[in-house]
From Swiss-Prot:
The species this protein was found in: Rhodospirillum rubrum (strain ATCC 11170 / ATH 1.1.1 / DSM 467 / LMG 4362 / NCIMB 8255 / S1)
Binding positions (ATP): 3, 163-164, 205-211
Taxonomic lineage of the native organism: Bacteria, Pseudomonadati, Pseudomonadota, Alphaproteobacteria, Rhodospirillales
Pathway: Amino-acid biosynthesis; L-proline biosynthesis; L-glutamate 5-semialdehyde from L-glutamate: step 1/2
UniProt xrefs under SMART domains: PUA (SM00359)
SUPFAM superfamilies tied to this protein: Carbamate kinase-like, PUA domain-like
Record function comment: Catalyzes the transfer of a phosphate group to glutamate to form L-glutamate 5-phosphate.
Catalytic activity: L-glutamate + ATP = L-glutamyl 5-phosphate + ADP
Protein name: Glutamate 5-kinase
Domain of life: Bacteria
Location in or out of the cell: Cytoplasm
GO annotation (BP), single: L-proline biosynthetic process
PUA domain residues: 269-346
Amino acid sequence: MIKIGSALLVDQGSGLVRTGWLKALAEDIAQLRAEGREVLIVSSGAIAVGRRSLHLEPGRMRLDEKQAAAAAGQIELAHAYRTVMADHAINVAQLLLTLDDSENRRRYLNARNCLETLLRLGVIPVINENDTVTTQEIRFGDNDRLAARVAQMACADALILLSDIDGLYTADPHRDPEARFIPTVTALTPEIAAMAGAALTPHGTGGMVTKLLAARICMDAGCAMAIAPGKDDHALRLLRQGGRQTWFLPAEEPRTARKAWISGALKAEGTLWVDDGAARALAAGSSLLPPGVRTVEGDFQRGAAVRVVGLDGSPLAKGLIAYPSDEARLLVGHRSGDIEALLGYRGREELIHRDDLVLDSRFRHRDEDGEGHRS
């Protein structure tokens, strides 16, 4: 899978598609296809292209104007991709996805089935966020994480983020002359996260922050990811010839498709704060039971994705909760045997069953290093 940023695809001055660059990319993709590889593309650029055709001022667009620009730009981008790929007898298809399409299990599976069918028919899917219907609260916010979610959805072997940077450094190389290049990452440790220059929260923004968040989704799903320079023509060819790039290698034991979907969920609807005993039980593979929960935050329904954090706020896990928020609050601190008396019906013993629970990779590494929670 290849992710193409707006700055690579669209000339920032004129607002036109960089046709020569796109033709060179199409040649590289045609070569990959000739070698028997399936290719998917996640493409930005619709708003930038549409803004020009609608004569809208950059930096001053309202939400409705951005949505209009996206609608106009999608047609131009689709035409550009179809034109350059037709030179190689390759069909393309456009998929517009929203955050909810990846968070809702049924819609996620429907989108995955569509991708699989297109690939079986020899078509290259070109995917973008559906900016015409999304708002700031219900969007990916960047195509790095969209690309990672789709790579997970399509069971891709690798995701290549073509960018204006050539990989990960220990610090910003433009500001720190002693910054060292990192060619390979095998685990997203706190040290690696610190290199992004900001916290890796689900709502994190900024170039390297979103790329590391995308890497976490990919690695947990068993998909390798690369950050590679893409400004020059034939970026993929240069990459294969040994050009500089940072590879994030997947976990040795990738999660099941269901757990990878839970782990990759970007929108947690609530937070459960748990004590040290519960944290140790989670690390040992147990379900989350009511006695170990101290606080329930948020308003959510049964089956919602929630975060599980320690008393110090450190991330422990993400899971699908078995009770709505009002009932979960009633169960806090109580034994599982008290559930029927508290709720008036006999519910599940656990708030989150271990089959619906995924440990945070940072918590797993802390536990393996002997730095887990202690009483």
